[in-house]
C-alpha cells in the first residue's frame, strides 16, 4: 500500500487531494476552487513579508508602504498582494456563480462553510484596505465603520469600541492590522473544513445527477487541469502586476490620509461595489445597512428557496434566463456603486437593488414551481 495511504499525517491529505472521487464530466469551471487556494496561499506569503516592513502608526503607515519600493523585490510583494486581492474576489465570484448555476448550494454544509469563508474574506479585505492609510483608506474606514451606529441603542458605543476612541485613529489602525494578520489563518482553517465537507458530500456534477456517475480520482485527471488553470492565471496576473499595477487602485489612496480634507467621491474597492450600491439605494440609514448585510446573508438561505425538482439550471430554461439576468444585474450594481450619487444613477441603483432581492426571494421559488408544473405535468398524469 502506498505511504500516502498508510501514514496518519498523509492519509487525510490523500483523501482530500489525491484519491478524492470526482465526477468524470466536470469542466474548467471547477478550477476556481484550486485557484482560490492559490490566491489564499499567495496572499498569506506576500502579506507576511509585507508586514515585516509595515509600521502600524498613523504618522508612519503611509511612508512605510511606500518604503517597500526600496526593499529588494518589494514592489513585487506589494503589487502581487494588492492585485492578488482582486484576483481572489474575481475567482470567488466565479466560484459562487458556478454553484448557483449548477446547484452546488444544495450540498448544505459545504455551501454554508463557503459563505462563512466569503464573509470573512470580505472582512479581511476591508481591514487590509485601511492599512495603507491613504485618503480613501481613512475615509472608507470612517464611513464603513460608522454604519455600525445604525444599531439601535448601542450603535454609538459599538463604533467607539471599534475605533478605540472618538474617531478613526492610531488605535483603529493597530487593531485593524492585528486582525488583518490573523484572519487569513482562520480562513485557511475554514478552507480545510470546507474540503472535509466536500469529501463527505462529494463534488457536484454539471448535470446535477444525485446518483453517482462514473467517478475518477482527483489526481492526475484534475490536478493536470488545475495546473493548467494556475499557470494561465499567474500569467494574466503577472501582466497586470508588471505592466499596469495600479489599474484597480484609487488615485485618492496615493495621497496621505488627512482628516480635514474629504475626497470628492468615497467608494470602496470594486469587489465591494455591489453591496455599496445597495447601501446607497435605500434613503434610510438603518434600512440601507440592513439591506447591505442581507444582500450577502441571503446566500445562507438560498437552499431553502430552491423549489425545483432539478438540481441545476442546464435543464431549466426559465431558470437560466433568470440567472443570466441576475449576472447582468450584479454587473450593473457594481457599475452604479462606482458612480456619484445623482440622477439618473440614484433611480437606476434603486431598481437594480430591488431586482437583486426580487431574484432571490420571489423569482427563484416561483420559477421552480412553474418549471415543475411544465416539465413534470405529463409525468404526474402518467402516475395517475
UniProtKB/Swiss-Prot annotation:
Cofactor dependence is on: heme b
An annotated GO cellular component:
mitochondrial inner membrane
Residues at which heme b b562 binds: 81, 180
Record key words, sorted:
Electron transport, Heme, Iron, Membrane, Metal-binding, Mitochondrion, Mitochondrion inner membrane, Respiratory chain, Transmembrane, Transmembrane helix, Transport, Ubiquinone
Q: Keyword Transport on this protein?
A: yes
Instruction: Name the Gene Ontology biological process terms.
Output: mitochondrial electron transport, ubiquinol to cytochrome c
The note on cofactor binding and number reads: Binds 2 heme b groups non-covalently.
- Residues where a ubiquinone binds: 199
Which Gene Ontology MF annotations are present?
metal ion binding; ubiquinol-cytochrome-c reductase activity
Q: How does it sit in the membrane?
A: Multi-pass membrane protein
Q: Where does heme b b566 bind?
A: 95, 194
Where found? Mitochondrion inner membrane
Query: InterPro entries from the xrefs?
Result: Cyt_b/b6_C, Cyt_b/b6_C_sf, Cyt_b/b6_N, Cytb/b6-like_sf, Cytochrome_b, Cytochrome_b_C_euk/bac, Cytochrome_b_N_euk/bac, Di-haem_cyt_TM
Q: What residue intervals traverse the membrane?
A: 32-52, 75-96, 111-131, 176-196, 224-244, 286-306, 318-338, 345-366
Gene3D superfamilies assigned to the protein according to its UniProt record, in alphabetical order: Cytochrome Bc1 Complex, Chain C
Subunit (UniProt): The main subunits of complex b-c1 are: cytochrome b, cytochrome c1 and the Rieske protein.
Q: Which family, according to UniProt? A: Belongs to the cytochrome b family.
Q: What PANTHER family is this protein classified in?
A: CYTOCHROME B (PTHR19271:SF16)
What functional role does this protein have? Answer: Component of the ubiquinol-cytochrome c reductase complex (complex III or cytochrome b-c1 complex) that is part of the mitochondrial respiratory chain. The b-c1 complex mediates electron transfer from ubiquinol to cytochrome c. Contributes to the generation of a proton gradient across the mitochondrial membrane that is then used for ATP synthesis.
- General remark: Heme 1 (or BL or b562) is low-potential and absorbs at about 562 nm, and heme 2 (or BH or b566) is high-potential and absorbs at about 566 nm.
**Protein's UniProt name:** Cytochrome b
Organism this protein belongs to? Acropora tenuis (Purple tipped acropora)
Specify the taxonomic lineage: Eukaryota, Metazoa, Cnidaria, Anthozoa, Hexacorallia
Gene of this entry: MT-CYB
